[in-house]
Amino acid sequence: MGMRMMFTVFLLVVLATTVVSFTSDRAPDGRNAAAKAFGLITPTVRKGCCSNPACMLKNPNLC
């Protein structure tokens, strides 16, 4: 194989890897993993803050 052909194959492999990794971290409903994690963390923070009077006074919008 020539240098040009090897470079073309390299680019195709990089493109295929990028497409696979980009689509594999998406959830079926369209939300990605970071958005799901944030959705799980938020109620936990609210629950912890609302039980602490000092935090509740600082963040009344959470409780």
From Swiss-Prot:
It holds the Pfam family Toxin_8. Keywords: Acetylcholine receptor inhibiting toxin, Amidation, Calcium channel impairing toxin, Cleavage on pair of basic residues, Disulfide bond, Ion channel impairing toxin, Neurotoxin, Pharmaceutical, Postsynaptic neurotoxin, Secreted, Signal, Toxin, Voltage-gated calcium channel impairing toxin. Its main location: secreted. Residues 51-53 are annotated as: Ser-Xaa-Pro motif, crucial for potent interaction with nAChR. One of its GO terms (molecular function) is acetylcholine receptor inhibitor activity. Negative results: shows a very weak inhibition of tetrodotoxin (TTX)-resistant sodium channels. Does not show activity at TTX-sensitive sodium channels, L- or T-type calcium channels, opioid receptors, TRPV1 and KCNQ1 channels. In vivo, does not exhibit any significant side-effects for spontaneous locomotor activity, cardiac and respiratory function and drug dependence. The cysteine framework is I (CC-C-C). Alpha4/7 pattern. This is Omega-conotoxin Eu1.6. It comes from Conus eburneus (Ivory cone).
